[in-house]
């Protein structure tokens, strides 16, 4: 083994080269129990692990980075549920009774218009007699809310029963600036 680790005769000026060659030649002569058929060309880099081992290394590295980012994250960005609820549009709106909202017709069955206004439940309103053909799927309408959830407690029941609908009165179509300008152009012609 001492023969394998012997440094080559190098001039005194290249001390770094001596140390480098000594460490390179000693690397293969350690505790490995090979047949001595190691290649003399030890300048090749070690092969990277492949397959599952490399995937596991990458996954572990990503987990470490994510953990570091989580620990460094400022608590200002994290909002509590109570804070989110307090600042939600539904809570800011206050009591729903007699509020005017905008909804969109998403389903029609005969003369029943199913309107989504962004609440917990949709509402069902009758199609008006006047200009009923204007109320098509996708049309935006104005509503006056009466109740966000129709519930009732039946005789002898201990819990409320809901029909999964809100109660609202259909006020009419939502008029946009574009529709007003189109009507004015028609009247002027």
UniProtKB/Swiss-Prot annotation:
InterPro entries: Ribosomal_bS1m. It comes from Bos taurus (Bovine). The modification Phosphoserine is found at residue 74. This is Small ribosomal subunit protein bS1m. Belongs to the bacterial ribosomal protein bS1 family. GO terms for cellular component: mitochondrial inner membrane; mitochondrial small ribosomal subunit. GO terms for biological process: mitochondrial translation. It holds the Pfam family MRP-S35. Residues 30-44 have a biased composition (Low complexity). It comes from the Eukaryota. The modification N6-acetyllysine is found at residue 134. It is found in: Mitochondrion. Keywords: Acetylation, Mitochondrion, Phosphoprotein, Ribonucleoprotein, Ribosomal protein, Transit peptide. Component of the mitochondrial ribosome small subunit (28S) which comprises a 12S rRNA and about 30 distinct proteins. Residues 1-72 form a transit peptide. Residues 30-53 are annotated as: Disordered.
């Amino acid at each position: 083994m001492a023969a394998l680790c012997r440094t080559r005769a190098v001039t005194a000026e290249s001390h770094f080269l001596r140390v480098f060659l000594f460490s390179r030649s000693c690397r293969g002569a350690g505790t490995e129990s090979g047949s001595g058929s190691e290649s003399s060309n030890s300048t090749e880099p070690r092969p990277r692990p492949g397959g599952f081992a490399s995937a596991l290394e990458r996954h572990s590295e990503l987990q470490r980075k994510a953990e570091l980012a989580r620990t460094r994250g400022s608590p200002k960005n994290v909002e509590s549920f109570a804070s989110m609820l307090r600042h939600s549009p539904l809570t800011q709106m206050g009591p729903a009774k007699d509020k005017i909202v905008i909804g969109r017709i998403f389903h029609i069955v005969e003369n029943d218009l199913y309107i989504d206004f962004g609440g917990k439940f949709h509402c069902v309103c009758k199609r008006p007699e006047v200009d009923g053909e204007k109320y098509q799927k996708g049309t935006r309408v104005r509503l006056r809310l009466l109740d966000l959830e129709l519930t009732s407690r039946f005789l002898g029941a201990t819990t409320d029963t809901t029909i999964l609908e809100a109660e609202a009165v259909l006020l009419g179509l939502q008029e946009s600036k574009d529709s007003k300008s189109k009507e004015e152009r028609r009247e002027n012609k």
